[in-house]
Amino acid sequence: KQGYESLKKIADLKGKKMKTLGMKNVEKFLNKIVKHKLQNSLMIWGAPGIGKSSIVQAIAEKNNLTLIDLRISQLAPTDLRGIPVPSDDSASWLPPDFLPTSGKGILFLDEINMAPPAVQGIAQQLILDRRVGSYKVPDGWFIWSAGNRKEDFAAVFDMPAPLANRFIHLEVKTSLDEFKYYALHNNIDDRIISYLNFRPKHLHKIDKNSPSWPSPRSWDIANSLLSAG
């Protein structure tokens, strides 16, 4: 009964906005989705540079799933739908080779709300129906998405209501404690952690007037520069 109630709570989240969660809790939630093989589509919201894509990659690696990472904002509608191939009296659509045809994995539609409406429309078919034209997503695949929010000064489009209502929405936040945990397990330079202990607000601080600003991703880049000497 307890397992049933847990699954029911997850199912009831579809189309609703969850409260903001930390990285660890989001990771636990995604692992539960995979464990119970729930094919509900997910939308991960969060500021740029906090590690949304990294969470999905970690889930794929932990569960031995293939990850196909599609930057939807860089695709045209025909890139997802494929191209028509004529025959004697009709034409069929040849799907793109980057879409999965077998196995198990995560089809990750990143930057989905940065894509123009025409592309979101094709993606909507993929998410709602798990198919586009004659192409069908294999049963062993999860379809997850991610995107930035308008308040992050991101160049995003409004998400169509039918598409938004299909998702389980997860809003991700970052914290210094979680970044320090990540740093401990990924050989992040002690000087970075010492500085962030002194200036915790500099872990993630968007500056709309500057192209460079601190984020967990930029601190990771800084660490690679420090490692190089």
List the predicted regions and their residue ranges:
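Conserved AAA+ ATPase small/helical "lid" subdomain
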Residues: 182-229
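Arg/Lys-rich, low-complexity, intrinsically disordered basic segments
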Residues: 1-15
